[in-house]
Amino acid sequence: MTHTFAENYDVIVIGAGHAGVEAGLAASRMGCKTLLATINLDMVAFMPCNPSIGGSAKGIVVREIDALGGEMGRNIDKTYIQMKMLNMGKGPAVRALRAQADKAEYASEMKRTVERQENLTLRQTMIDEILVEDGKVIGVRTATNQKFSAKAVVVTTGTALRGEIIIGDLKYSSGPNNSLASITLADNLKELGLEIGRFKTGTPPRVNARTINYEDTEIQPGDEKPNHFSFLSKDEDYLLDQIPCWLTYTNATSHEIINSNLHRAPMFSGIVKGIGPRYCPSIEDKIVRFADKERHQLFLEPEGRNTDEIYVQGLSTSLPEDVQQDLIHSIKGLENAQMMRTGYAIEYDMVMPHQLRATLETKKISGLFTAGQTNGTSGYEEAAGQGIVAGINAALKVQGKPELILKRSDGYIGVMIDDLVTKGTVEPYRLLTSRAEYRLILRHDNADMRLTEIGRQVGLVDDERWQVFQIHKNQFDNEMKRLESIKLKPIKETNEKVVAMGFKPLTDALTAKEFMRRPDVTYADAVAFIGPAAEDLDAKTIELIETEVKYEGYIAKALDQVEKMKRMEEKRIPADIDWDDIDSIATEARQKFKLISPETIGQASRISGVNPADISILMVYLEGRSRSISKNKSKDSH
């Protein structure tokens, strides 16, 4: 079929949510002429659910996006109303930053960034069809029958694909927040041969801030100590004029209201068919699943500086509106609260992610990438992390350059993508620190050390960011060398100072670094003996030094494990392998290998249902196959 294209692009991104903006910005910043298409220009980087960025594991993802050259970290640093470091009483591996966002300002600031980006065109249009010829993407067709050519297309449609909002027994076609649903494109993805699933998520009601009795709630302030998501943000710009959140709880009356109305709950009446998120369940689901719990936490989160809307975190529901109102009034502090928006559930189509490569390109169609909730994840941060990887790889494909695959040891983004493409998901996927086997080396404080060089290599990290990183890295390296080179001796003068500071006296000579390994000794304590560094070190560098020194032994063990797995990852599995040709492999393993088509031995070993014996048989088979090919080549050469 011959197509007449109105405009020509290198990359087209469908959807301008959190995945879409990162994909569009990445591709355009790497030099590709890019179209970012959205159903509604007023919903660019919109937050249809919680007004926050970050949190456990997610906050580390935002740092990783920033380290690669992405925008989410910088944008939230410009638009937060509260910043808080979580899990400070725990180890460094699980600490993560969380910010309350000014929801409207976050979206408008990101839209401004997109509008000003060179090589990037932002357009309001409905994409109805992805045009494919000979198994390759060639462009898209809009609802108004305009055709645009492209060498790569990234689908980041969020919950809009055949979206349906559900409140009680009311069910209607809609994307998030009553936007248009994308129905024709959902049909098109099926026609292209992709396996489609059906998931569900939800959002809580919003209440009027002026109708809350705050005296009956617990105030939750932000941090006074400066913290940022972006490695480019400066401590002097930290906002001290923050807005608090408040904590309250459900109670026996709340639970009784829910239990007596379960027959009207879409989740239990059969109206909801999609599979919901395990780690962000609705309040009715929580009451049923955790019937022994007397109460559940609810956080009252402001949606911005210029609105009275309060997001009731923990009260996600699709119960009928009258039940939602009764439920709100049963909660301490909300007895007279006015509901401004009802909570709702939303069902949507998604692409089963086992059909993707680790680049987020579909295996079936060359040049077609998917990212975000389209791939079955939940959360803005998970979406943005996939978006930047899909955008990078779309650009690299167009440019004919080697692809980018982030390993599990590179970052939480790598963990997430590997989980999705290797194990698939049967429910909305959420990142957790427990999913990462190398979490001690995947911390929030070292994201730039892990990923900024990668971002520079692919052409996404600009000169400003690269210079900031180089200064930070050089300061860290130089100070680590200094701590290793200076020795403290157990002489009288030194030990008097050690004891005066509340530490046990030295019995042997040791380096400043070894002294810092004592649990109660800080970097500042070590500096009291050895003097300050040649250059002033910022809080980020000092935090990194303390963590690397105190956990050096554990970090070394983790890096050894990474090296062992690296050898497995380097053993490639040929794309043309015939899985039926391998004798003795278990039936379940054979079925999983056929379904997922692992690209490396490492990936094959992580597929659920595959045991070590299957991997051993596979490795023996591949070695024999390699020898056979070498012999045939040798015969042919003679």
UniProtKB/Swiss-Prot annotation:
The gene coding this protein:
mnmG
Provide the GO MF annotations for this entry: flavin adenine dinucleotide binding
- PROSITE patterns on file: GIDA_1, GIDA_2
Q: Would you identify the family this protein belongs to, as annotated? A: Belongs to the MnmG family.
Query: What is the name listed in the Swiss-Prot or TrEMBL entry for this protein?
Result: tRNA uridine 5-carboxymethylaminomethyl modification enzyme MnmG
Q: What's an example GO cellular component term for this entry?
A: cytosol
Question: Where are the bilayer-spanning segments?
Answer: none
Assembly and interactions? Homodimer. Heterotetramer of two MnmE and two MnmG subunits.
Primary location: cytoplasm
**Entry-linked Pfam families:** GIDA (PF01134), GIDA_C_1st (PF21680), SAM_GIDA_C (PF13932)
Origin organism lineage: Bacteria, Bacillati, Bacillota, Bacilli, Lactobacillales
- Organism (species): Streptococcus suis (strain 05ZYH33)
Q: Which residues bind NAD(+)?
A: 276-290
Which purpose does this protein serve, as stated in its record? Answer: NAD-binding protein involved in the addition of a carboxymethylaminomethyl (cmnm) group at the wobble position (U34) of certain tRNAs, forming tRNA-cmnm(5)s(2)U34.
